[in-house]
Amino acid sequence: MAQSVTGIQIGGTSFPPAVKPPGSGNTLFLGGAGVRGMEIQGNFVKFTAIGVYLEDKAVPALSVKWKGKTAEELTESVEFFREIVTGPFEKFTQVTMILPLTGQQYSEKVSENCVAIWKKFGIYTDAEAKAIEKFIEVFKDQTFPPGASILFTQSPNGSLMIGISKDGSIPEVGNAVIENKLLSESVLESIIGKQGVSPEARKSVATRLSELLKESDHCVAGNEKVDECTKEAENKA
């Protein structure tokens, strides 16, 4: 599949069609990408560019329920994105700075959002509190100039590997691993979920997967078939 999925350029950030995430033996394809920004005094200010990558088997896994849905239907579906976030396949998220940011600013904002949601649903336990402490510790002394990236490898077993790149490369190993499924899922959901920080990335993922899923009737037979149908979808797009 990796060869037939196109890359995405967002400003000065290029998201290639496929990457091998830190700590992973798999090559993941680019599910979608978009910016995180905010309206400030009438201007849309872009803070980060975000790319979301998925393991090949995400397509047959999602096709069972979502094939034939339009990009608009998928964009509006809370359940669809929950299946991406919680699905039994690897995910990789690259957050690249457009404006400079400190590690403390980033980790505290992510942590606040996660804890608020967990407390709302009554799922915040000591395990999550310890995971948040470790998450904040990873970023404590970091600074991220424009072009630097924070990298999240999300394993189906619930582990979250955090990597840091200051030169645009993707390292083979990460800086830390946090064994907490809820945190791992929440990091991705905070980006492409219904209330996520990048509606543009959410729409991009929905649009690209809608095209792949259209051709997924014969994708469930294995990776070779997935690759074939992906090429067909790309040719039609």
Swiss-Prot record:
One of its GO terms (molecular function) is chalcone isomerase activity. Pathway: Secondary metabolite biosynthesis; flavonoid biosynthesis. It catalyses: a chalcone = a flavanone. InterPro entries: CFI (IPR044164), Chalcone_isomerase (IPR016087), Chalcone_isomerase_3-sand (IPR016088), Chalcone_isomerase_bundle_sf (IPR016089), Chalcone_isomerase_sf (IPR036298). It comes from the Eukaryota. Disulfide bonds: none annotated. GO terms for biological process: flavonoid biosynthetic process. The record marks 106 as: Important for catalytic activity. Keywords: Flavonoid biosynthesis, Isomerase. The keyword DNA repair does not apply. Catalyzes the intramolecular cyclization of bicyclic chalcones into tricyclic (S)-flavanones. Responsible for the isomerization of 4,2',4',6'-tetrahydroxychalcone (also termed chalcone) into naringenin. Part of the biosynthetic pathway for all classes of flavonoids, a large class of secondary plant metabolites, many of which are brightly colored. Belongs to the chalcone isomerase family. This is Chalcone--flavanone isomerase 2. It comes from Fragaria ananassa. The gene is CHI2.
